[in-house]
Amino acid sequence: MLDHITDVMAPPGIAAFFQGWQLYQSVVQNNCMEHREIGTALRRVFESIDPEFSVLDLGCGDSSMAIKALEGLRVSSYTGVDLTAPALDVARANFHGTYSATWMHANMVDYITTVDQQFDVIMTSFAMHHLPADIKKAWLVDIAKHLTPWGCLVLIDTCCPADMSRDETVQMYLDLIADWPVSTEDKTIIAKHMWSSDFPESEAFINDALAAAGLSHTTIYHHQHGLQLGYVCRR
């Protein structure tokens, strides 16, 4: 199906998305970013929550991580938010759950400030590091306001190892990517994206920002090289 969507007649934006999406699928399938470990951690968290629970997925992409982790659980509703419309189309096509699912084409930062609803689970994976530092802090405050009293934030993201700068962290990540089973062209695409768009913070920064939002955290996942983390955060 995808080869038809990425046909040369497709609009450039659509074709570019599916080129990147296929690269992402290769990264996931080869576990380059430890998606299996992250998926296992997410599943444990979701299984521990009393049913039924509502989920808001900020920066959901194609929702594949959430859909898999929520499979078979008693979910009351799922809302995915992303700025990339083709990703949402893929999410809708791949969803076969029995619970109510809605996808919103919106900026994840703006959405959380305008939605008039609280959620039992708000999750975000590999999205926050694209934001400037001050926006990260304000975003976490807004997220905390939209949790039910018993709700939790599930945060998966890249981070800077202790005493490493953003540039040193990006370079360390790229050194690992050099061994990924993807083409040289794809590695170049990833590198350009990371240098221009990735702004990971230290764990200390993230911890302080969560505390300022009134949230405490428990670690559910940590990357073998300290470049990624997973938290469950509650009031």
Task: Give the location of each predicted region.
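C-terminal alpha-helical "lid/dimerization" subdomain adjacent to the S-adenosyl-L-methionine
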Residues: 156-212
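Core SAM-dependent methyltransferase catalytic element
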Residues: 216-235
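A conserved beta-strand element that flanks and buttresses the S-adenosyl-L-methionine
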Residues: 123
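A short glycine-rich, Lys/Arg-flanked "PGG" loop and its adjoining helix->strand segment in the class I
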Residues: 137-149
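Short catalytic micro-motifs in class I SAM-dependent methyltransferases
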Residues: 126-127
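Short conserved loop adjoining the S-adenosyl-L-methionine
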Residues: 110-116
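Conserved class I S-adenosyl-L-methionine
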Residues: 2-50
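Class I SAM-dependent methyltransferase SAM/SAH-binding core
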Residues: 56, 63-110
